Amino acid sequence: MDYSIATLLSYFVDDKLVAGKFLEKKLGCESPEAIEALQIALDALEKMGVLVKERGKYNRVTREDVVEARLRCSSKGFCFAIQDDEDATDIYVREGNLSNAWNGDRVLVKVIKDGTRRKSPEEQVHLILDRANPSLLAQVKKSEDNYRAVPLDDRLLFELELQDKEQNLGEAVDHLVHVSVLRYPIAQHPPLGEVTKVLGSDAEAAADTDIVSCKHDLPLGWTPEAIEALQSLPKVIEPGELKKRTWITAKLQLVTFGDGPRGETLPWQEVALSLESQANQWQVGIHITDIAHYIAEDSLLDQLARKRGTTVYLEEQICPLFPEGLIGRCSLIPDEDRLALSFFLTVDDRGEVTGFEYHSSVVKVDHQLDFSEVQTALADIESVSGELKPYGGLLQELFFQICPLIKSQRLQRGSFNLQTETASPRLDEGRLGVIMTQETLPIRSLLAELMVVLQREVALQLQALGIPGLYCGQVAPEGEDLTDIVKLAGNLDLGVKIDLEGDIIPQHYHHLSQGFESLPAKAVLNHLLANTLKIEKYFSHPAPHFALAYDSGYTHCVSPAQRYGDLVIQRLLKLVLTEGRDRRTKQMKTGVELNAHTCRNQISWNVLPPNLQETIEGDLHQLVLGLNDREQTAEDAEKDLLGLKKAEKMKARAGEIFRGLITGVQSYGFFVQIFDLLAEGLVHVSSLKDDWYEFRSRQCALVGRKSRTSYRLGNEVDVQVRSVDYYRQQIDLGAVNNAPKDSANMDFDDDDEDGDEREEQDTMDWDAMEDGDDDEGGAVIF
């Protein structure tokens, strides 16, 4: 099993000694060669002062002059070490101190020279923990005696030698290729790579999904060993397993929801719902397929899923967490017995959850419902007929009463919604952490309300049991993240006041999104607001969740076939049922119900055996960092594909004129978000030939000296598509001469104290642009 230094070091937690044998087991070192390689790594880390050996075991050394961070480099070679702590200062690392580290690598950075009043401390990459670029996109070129690959990512300032074994690289010269890194640079030896796929003559000739999957190193296929492991899984449910579980098939209607043509069985049906009306309350059943039963911990399929972390959606192409063959065994399809974990929420007539319990179960789904079909039926619930008629009561109570009540509770707590035109593949709040509503399909977001409140209850149950958990949180945005959109809201006279020096709270987003509702540009504004949110992160402890307005205690559990973290939670919940102690001592006649809310505040003992609890804590600590990295990669890849799609559409419409909203103004030009496609481009100041334009930072505007014509944040303008850089997703726009003359409404007199400095800075920026600094040469599409 391959592993990084970061993975190895993640097993050193809480200043505890770790035996070499323990690491061999955890890292899958079975052969003599693998054990020897591990020992070499341990010896090297000991010599570097990262580990210390005590009584035959190892411990991690904590040093104040060494910090862990991820490298972020620019195309000019400037590199900063970005620490995981949001409040930590970024560390500048000179090019000569990178120690062969590349952009994106996780590293240990060490202070090699203390700072003075005039100079910052000098830092050096002490150790590369994890490589971020196991493969890359490049262009092949022929040198005197071999072939080389030039990375397309201009932040990777090197060339790779190409291995020319049984490959006709001459045919690939000047073509876009996917290169697998065989050897990273070491001493005088340059990096070595191997061409694994020729994508096309250039980026535009290649398939966009190929570009994205190769760029982000997404695994699309499965090894023969993985397929063999899949085939060895049981194809039928063992009779003994059925006897251990609660049957949820006789008394309740079970339905699943999905997107697809009527009558078509949809893959990966992970969740089924049931509903039972009671006096002044409901019992809502949420039944989740039991992936944990089939995927044993540390099995080959589990290791591969852990490495993938999450399913990545590239439109029709999906990079799944598990092989497709698992669908037939686990998916909750109609009229088939399936193993599940069944959760029951008691919801009162105010939308508050008053009861929670869960069971290992067997379920049989009665019917699969299509979102669009249900939305149409709910518009005229009295006339529901055909196959939907038996479920009319369930749908009416679920979407007209229960989910709206739960939503009301969430909004009263301080949470908010944002509108979107595209549906998320997730049933819950998704990676951005906010419930997105669709005007055409509002039941999707209503169903998400139910998933969110279930996941909150699961987190509360884990905390009440005192067992380790994998929690989901979201960091609040910084004031500077909202600067432009708050100024934009002010220019649009929305009347929303936000103190950017203070804490940003969810109510700020609620007020902004509510203010956008009445504006023609609301789609653009909601899109911009969503882009200010940080994606969710995993934690090994309860953490606040910004968009959902939870102080602490939230997790994910409804998608164990699509997110590895959900599978981990499923295993923990099942472990409670099989290994949990429901009473302090065996002498006690009665115990608590560990699977129900009634045990909360009743437990004063260790529910799990201490050794097991300690092992789980260590595993979760090791897991968190990897899962967060994979979620970020998935988010980047999905955004990348969307950006390529938009760039392709805009390139095909070069020369056309579009209406858009000015969303940012700088000294070098202004950014325009085009209404039709939500694509953003840059109108460079050099393209404004009718006047000399000056940047006014206070008004967020570019103002013509003679004409007083202004391009101001929040103005609507017509722009023409001049050119598009497809791979970099940069759109160059030109302004059509229809900008408003705002001199009557705004004070554009040259009375700023920093006027001369501003004008000089404008000139400097422009000079830098002409000298070839293309960092501002176009807008990256978000």
Curated annotation (Swiss-Prot):
PANTHER family documented for this protein: DIS3-LIKE EXONUCLEASE 2, RIBONUCLEASE
Protein name as annotated:
Acetazolamide conferring resistance protein zam
Q: Which organism is it from?
A: Synechocystis sp. (strain ATCC 27184 / PCC 6803 / Kazusa)
Could you tell me which residues belong to the region Disordered?
Answer: 737-782
Q: What is the primary gene name for this protein?
A: zam
Q: Where are the transmembrane segments?
A: none
Q: Which PROSITE patterns match?
A: RIBONUCLEASE_II, S1
Pfam families xrefs:
CSD2, OB_RNB, RNB, S1
Compositionally biased region (Acidic residues): 747-782
User: What is the role of the protein in this entry?
Assistant: Not known; control resistance to the carbonic anhydrase inhibitor acetazolamide.
Q: Which UniProt keywords apply?
A: Exonuclease, Hydrolase, Nuclease
| Domain annotation S1 motif: ranges | 655-736
State the similarity comment.
Answer: Belongs to the RNR ribonuclease family.
Matching InterPro entries: CSD, CSD2, NA-bd_OB-fold, RNase_B_OB_dom, RNase_II/R, RNase_II/R_CS, RNR_Ribonuclease, S1_domain
Q: Where is the RNB domain?
A: 270-579
This entry's Gene Ontology molecular function terms read: exonuclease activity; RNA binding; RNA nuclease activity
Q: Does Acetylation appear among the keywords?
A: no
